[in-house]
A protein has these predicted regions:
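Acidic donor-binding segment of Leloir-type glycosyltransferases
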Residues: 20-62
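A conserved hydrophobic helix/loop-capping motif in glycosyltransferases and polysaccharide synthases
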Residues: 2-15, 19, 26, 36
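Cell-envelope/extracellular polymer assembly enzymes that use nucleotide-activated donors
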Residues: 1-4, 32, 178
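Donor-binding/catalytic cores of nucleotide-activated saccharide
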Residues: 68-69, 91-193, 200-208
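Short aromatic/hydrophobic "clamp" motif used to bind/position activated sugar donors
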Residues: 84
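Glycine-rich, basic loop-to-helix element that forms the pyrophosphate-binding segment
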Residues: 63-79, 89
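Catalytic core of nucleotide-sugar-dependent glycosyltransferases
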Residues: 195-233, 241, 252-269
Length: 301
């Protein structure tokens, strides 16, 4: 078995049928599908049982509430593939998703192959001149700190052995952010293919946005210990995250709390010409105080 496709399902996902059909439509054939469901409705469980009964590729796991574990970890425990990928139950993948990712994984002996995802925007042209970027060893973490590589777990193929001694945290808010930099640390070769292969259903998430800044500080400690030469890049990344989170948080006092992180790390970002103009403008506005930045973020959303 080459690839295990893990679909973690929380609650009643209305697009699961569409998701599974896109997975079963792959042109690459050597794969299995593991559907892990938590708190599934009766109809959801019936649907998953139907899929498992009628397609030998599919394994259905009905998680009970007392099993305090991330659904992705449960899928990984059952996975038989040399490689794994994760698909959210509201999303769909291109029919050649596995074909492209496996080609680049085997061509470059890569442990991670990453592609692009899109939401509700129609793609008129999926052809890009610079077709692939290959990062090796410490280049991987550097480019993650430089924000050339993203922290999303979706739209990627992983060598399953990367997850030896690495698990997703039980708390599923920002579990990807808290895990991906640890995988990048273990990865020797990462290929970024500039193709849109994954459709992400746009929906409003009820995230605890403030918790992410705490996880950023957790990441800072990791970088300080293992990649001290990248510490300033990490501080730029945290400054940008804090500004982004300010645009998401409704409570004014919470935005003020995030602004303290902007003040703490903005000196590392203020002259960083890699940053998009909009982000640099926000960093500059922060020098004029919280009220100015807060207002500027609202009018430039």
């Amino acid at each position: 078995m080459k690839v295990s496709i893990i679909i973690p399902v929380k609650n009643n996902e209305i697009f699961l049928n569409r998701c599974v059909e896109s997975v079963l439509n792959q042109t690459y054939n050597d794969y299995e599908v593991i559907i892990v469901v938590e708190n599934g409705t009766e109809n959801m469980i019936k649907l998953c049982n139907f899929y498992e009964k009628n397609n030998k590729k599919i394994t259905f796991i009905n998680k009970v509430n007392k099993m305090r574990n991330n659904l992705k970890n449960i899928g990984l425990e059952k996975a038989k593939g040399e490689y794994v990928t994760f698909v959210n139950p509201n999303d769909t993948i291109d029919k050649e998703f596995l074909k492209y990712h496996m080609y680049f994984a085997e061509t470059h002996n890569a442990e991670i192959v990453s592609s692009r995802f899109y939401t509700n925007k129609r793609l008129f042209n999926n052809k890009i001149k610079d077709y692939e970027s290959v990062y090796r060893d410490k280049e991987i973490m550097k480019n993650y700190m430089l924000m050339n590589i993203r922290s999303n777990v979706i739209a990627k193929l992983y060598k399953k052995s990367l997850f030896n001694n690495i698990e997703f945290p039980p708390e599923e808010y920002y579990d990807e952010f808290r895990t991906m930099y640890k995988l990048y640390d273990k990865c020797n070769t990462l290929v970024d293919i500039k193709l849109y292969t994954y459709y992400k259903e746009s929906k409003q998430e009820n995230y605890d946005y403030l918790s992410k800044i705490d996880y950023c500080v957790e990441m800072l400690g990791f970088i300080e210990e293992k990649y001290p030469e990248l510490i300033n890049y990490c501080k730029v990344k945290i400054c940008c995250e804090a500004i982004y989170l300010m645009s998401k948080v409704e409570d004014r006092n919470d935005r003020k709390y995030l602004f303290e992180y902007v003040k703490l790390f903005r000196k590392y970002a203020i002259n960083d010409r890699r940053l998009p103009r909009k982000v640099r403008s926000r960093v500059m506005k922060s020098l004029l105080g919280f009220n100015m930045l807060d207002t500027y973020i609202k009018i430039t959303k």
